[in-house]
């Protein structure tokens, strides 16, 4: 089963920053993280953690659960593109 395209969390964060007219440095400062960490988050090189989700809920809005759901949906969609399950078989009772 092919999943729909899910937005990368970093893209959603970037859209919010653009709407707020906030720079990467301002965002990093508000989140109390290094600018390099903020950059990795926005580019998808770092996954959104529960700690980041809590901070995002305060700094940008929405719930921590929404941010984690977004990350999980995107991560699962990406994994489905690369994980080869063709040789796997379901375990059954005998």
UniProtKB/Swiss-Prot annotation:
Keywords: DNA-binding, Transcription, Transcription regulation. The keyword Ion transport does not apply. It comes from the Bacteria. GO terms for molecular function: DNA binding. This is Uncharacterized HTH-type transcriptional regulator YddM. InterPro entries: Cro/C1-type_HTH, Lambda_DNA-bd_dom_sf, Toxin_antidote_HigA. Coiled coil: none annotated. Residues 24-43 bind DNA. It comes from Escherichia coli O6:H1 (strain CFT073 / ATCC 700928 / UPEC). SUPFAM superfamilies: lambda repressor-like DNA-binding domains. PANTHER family: ANTITOXIN HIGA-1. Belongs to the VapA/VapI family. Residues 13-67 form the HTH cro/C1-type domain.
